[in-house]
A protein has these predicted regions:
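Class I S-adenosyl-L-methionine-dependent methyltransferase catalytic core
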Residues: 1-229
Length: 229
């Protein structure tokens, strides 16, 4: 709302028509408008580049609404987004005819709140509409582990969320079902050997969140499948 994008765009493209909206703008050059109520019918047949920093909302719900709305008429979408949009599950919000062209991590303290630096784990992505649909990455089939319930005599527990995400050991009884996965290792694999290799893996996906670290089953399987026996 303070024109961080607008003022730079006007310098770069002085001859282009630039519309700027915010529900509570800080400068006069930005019109007061709820973007999700913007009437795009008069411009939907033109080349439209949408650039901004949509509000994230709880579990990214608001920025997902912005993305879905933009996909109806945009040629490109360039947004600051929660870091969780590095995950394949979040990328699915974009229609399949949009292709990811750029994704970069923002520096720490990239935001300002009440005139103070504010850190929100975020990225900047550029998506472009094309005539072909992008390929959807399918979840991998697990090679070595089977997810089971705690009461089904699992071999190992794996921390699912929190500061110790992906911590894996044989302790089962004191582990919470809300914060852990429970797995059986396939019968032809030695559990101790698997555990040793597991604990050497680098699970980068666990850091792709705005809140506490976490890892999904598909993300876990993708990395565990790289183990070689």
């Amino acid at each position: 709302g303070n024109g961080a994008f607008l003022l730079e765009l006007k310098k770069l493209y002085p001859n282009n028509k630039i519309l700027a909206f915010d529900i509570k703008p800080d400068i006069e050059e930005i019109k007061v408008l709820d973007f999700l109520k913007f009437d795009y019918e008069l411009i939907k047949d033109k080349t439209i580049h949408i650039i901004g920093n949509p509000p994230f909302g709880r579990q990214s719900s608001t920025c997902k609404s912005f993305i879905k709305y933009c996909c109806k008429f945009a040629t490109t979408i360039s947004f600051i987004l929660p870091k969780s949009f590095k995950k394949e599950s979040c990328k699915k919000i974009f229609l399949l005819d949009f292709h990811l062209k750029l994704s970069i991590d923002l520096d720490a303290n990239a935001f300002t709140l009440d005139d103070k630096d504010h850190n929100v784990p975020s990225i900047f992505q550029i998506w472009q509409k094309e005539s072909t649909k992008r390929l959807v990455i399918k979840d991998e089939i697990s090679k070595y582990i089977l997810f089971v319930k705690k009461e089904d005599n699992p071999d190992l527990s794996i921390r699912r969320v929190g500061v110790n995400t992906t911590k894996c050991d044989k302790e089962i009884d004191d582990k919470s079902v809300q914060s852990h996965y429970f797995v059986k290792v396939k019968e032809d694999i030695d559990i101790d050997s698997f555990l040793e290799k597991f604990n050497k893996l680098n699970f980068n996906d666990k850091d792709n969140t705005v809140g506490p670290k976490s890892i999904s089953k598909p993300e876990l399987i993708k990395t565990v499948n790289t183990i070689q026996f």
